[in-house]
């Protein structure tokens, strides 16, 4: 079962040192973030890229993230999805490959927005924030691996500047 970081109000502030300290103290739970239950249409699932193989195929670490996002997407069918990651390999961006993977498993393509310009987690956060603003998101739930989640949460919380809450789901 995947876990989710709890959403502590202090972690959603505008002071970087407080965001970092608070995020480091958060704990994993066996539950999906509550904001998905309270407002599934406004809460976006954000799947973070993890690089592709040289021939443009999905690596195992990225497939773990996609499997976790698929479970969340099936449980919360009204939640929009953002797949984020550039770095093309063999003419395919991470975002394109992730969208294709999800669509092949039954997720409607119109439910998925691609952010395919980013080349780092900081850029994932910055460029995805633009998408979340445009779509008037009320929350974001990141989907990534355990060893990446804390850094990603910090980057996204800094990018959204306390406008919306950010939580996370751990893949496999």
What kind of feature is each model-predicted range?
Residues 1-2:
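N-terminal targeting leaders that direct proteins to extracytoplasmic destinations
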Residues 5-11, 18, 24-172:
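A structural signal for short, hydrophobic/glycine-enriched beta-strand patches
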């Amino acid at each position: 079962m995947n876990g989710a970081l709890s959403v502590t109000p202090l972690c959603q502030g505008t002071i970087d040192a407080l965001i970092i300290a608070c995020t480091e103290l958060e704990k994993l739970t066996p539950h999906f973030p509550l904001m998905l239950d309270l407002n599934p249409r406004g809460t976006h699932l954000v799947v973070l890229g993890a690089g592709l193989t040289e021939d443009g195929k999905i690596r195992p670490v990225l497939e773990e993230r996609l499997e976790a996002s698929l479970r969340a997407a099936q449980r919360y069918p009204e939640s929009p999805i953002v797949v984020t990651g550039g770095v093309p390999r063999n003419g395919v961006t991470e975002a394109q490959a992730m969208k294709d993977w999800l669509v092949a498993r039954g997720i409607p393509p119109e439910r998925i927005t691609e952010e395919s310009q980013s080349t780092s987690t900081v850029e994932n956060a910055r460029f995805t924030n633009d998408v979340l603003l445009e779509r008037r998101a009320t929350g974001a739930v990141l989907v990534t691996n355990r060893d990446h989640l804390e850094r990603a949460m910090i980057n996204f919380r800094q990018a959204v500047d306390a406008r919306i809450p950010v939580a996370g789901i751990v893949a496999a």
